[in-house]
Amino acid sequence: MTDLDSSLPPSVRTAGDSWTITELVGATALGVAAARAAETAGPDPLIRDEFAGLLVSSASPAWARLADPELSWLDDDPHGKRAHRVGIDYQAVRTHYFDEYFDGALRAGIRQVVILAAGLDSRAYRLNWPAGTTVYEIDQPKVLEYKTETLQRHGATPAAVRRPVPVDLRDDWPAALTAAGFQAARPTAWLAEGLLPYLPSDAQDRLFEMVTALSAAGSQVAVEVFGMNSRSNAQRWLRMRERLGLDVNVAALTYHEPDRSDAAAWLARHGWRVHSVDNRDEMARLGRPVPEDLSDEAVRSTLLRAHLGGSTG
């Protein structure tokens, strides 16, 4: 169960809602990609995502400005610039964490990957996948279409067999995944990055139930679990709205439900061996510590990996 911030606005989400890349939840994928683009273009980058900038700049000039590694749109706001830089650091660290997760899964012999709510994730294009690896990307149809068409237009080709699965995770996504060629008898590496707050609590439980049901022994899953009482996203997006005209209220796009299951505890109860790390500990480990005076504005989350039977890799 998660503590909720009583100042959070009510969710504007509705059953069956959908979006393009610049609308609702789709726009959050652009914000995350902009952070990866800024990190990649900056000095001594922790991760390299050469496709993020293409995906962001193709959306609009305002989104392209957001990806500026110098954060020139915040030149007259030193505090806002420092706080936004910490947000970019967080995105870089979580990307690094999940990149390492996939490296470990591949070393363990897994060749079937499912990215849940893939958004503008470009791992199918940028990671060094062994021959025979298939990457399934599940997300809203228009979001996947935007990514595919944009990268094709720039001549990018996947580094693995990439199979988009256009379906809402609140619907019967296992059927769509199976229809795309997924084989439940093979070990799978699953990823749920930046996803859980955008699902109702019952849909989160169903998601984990289906992931478990579809996972052969030796499968792995990685999950990002947010602290729902953090105001960091709201403040970050407020600056973006005021400075760049990007009208996205992330807090209103998430589900604020006090009875949401604890992901690590749920997985442990259902046969997964879980290892987790506090995002701030991981940021410090990788040389991107959160400054003490910005602690209240920085993201709080848990990054976890879990294994189902078989080798832990």
From Swiss-Prot:
Keywords: Methyltransferase, S-adenosyl-L-methionine, Transferase. GO terms for molecular function: methyltransferase activity. Its EC number is 2.1.1.-. S-adenosyl-L-methionine binds at residues 139, 168-169. InterPro entries: Ppm1/Ppm2/Tcmp (IPR007213), SAM-dependent_MTases_sf (IPR029063), SAM_mthyl_Trfase_ML2640-like (IPR011610). GO terms for biological process: methylation. PANTHER family: S-ADENOSYL-L-METHIONINE-DEPENDENT METHYLTRANSFERASE YKTD-RELATED, S-ADENOSYL-L-METHIONINE-DEPENDENT METHYLTRANSFERASES SUPERFAMILY PROTEIN. Belongs to the UPF0677 family. Exhibits S-adenosyl-L-methionine-dependent methyltransferase activity. This is Putative S-adenosyl-L-methionine-dependent methyltransferase MAP_3563.
